[in-house]
Design a protein with these regions (language model features):
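Generic structural signal for short, flexible, solvent-exposed coil/loop and linker residues
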Residues: 5, 26-28, 40, 85, ...
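Acidic, low-complexity intrinsically disordered segments
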Residues: 47-132
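Short, surface-exposed, low-complexity cationic segments
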Residues: 21-47
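Hydrophobic residues positioned within well-ordered beta-strands of beta-sheet architectures
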Residues: 7, 18, 35-37, 51
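Short N-terminal edge-element motif at the start of the domain
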Residues: 1-30
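A structural detector for beta-sheet-dominated domains
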Residues: 12, 19-21, 40-42, 52-56, ...
């Protein structure tokens, strides 16, 4: 995976650093490609969250790989009525708020947290029009 520069984002008064990147799975059935969003709370680099978006998890793959709605080179998920670009700060802000409200606490955690159902999460979260 190519090295990505960390980007800074302010979420509810806290500063986070984040990056996106492409990597390849070692074990896969349909596709080795995956994207990952990594987010750190500033000064808490030992407890990032890694959100994985695996093409392998795309629900359209078993039906017809050629009709897949996941564009790896763009880092976004597209379905009939929305596009979610993982490189947009507004999208990252929604993801950070979601994980802070659920289970991720970077100030008390001592280890990285991995979330492997990124595609499913994107389909469940509400992204306002124009955020991408």
């Amino acid at each position: 995976m190519a090295k990505s520069l960390l980007r800074k984002i302010n979420v509810d008064g806290s500063i986070y650093l984040w990056k996106t990147g492409h990597y390849h799975l070692k074990e896969f059935k349909h596709s080795e490609c995956a994207e990952r969003v990594t987010v750190y709370l500033k000064d808490y680099k030992n407890s990032p969250i890694h959100i994985h978006f695996r093409l392998e998890d795309n629900s359209y793959l078993p039906e017809d790989l050629a009709k897949s709605n996941w564009f790896i080179n763009w880092g976004c998920l597209q379905n009939k009525n929305k596009v979610v670009n993982l490189n947009r700060p507004g999208v990252i802000k929604i993801l950070i708020r979601y994980f802070i409200s659920k289970e991720w606490n970077p100030e008390t955690s001592k280890t990285p947290y991995h979330y492997y159902s990124g595609l499913k999460l994107l389909s469940e979260l509400d992204f306002p029009e124009g955020i991408n």
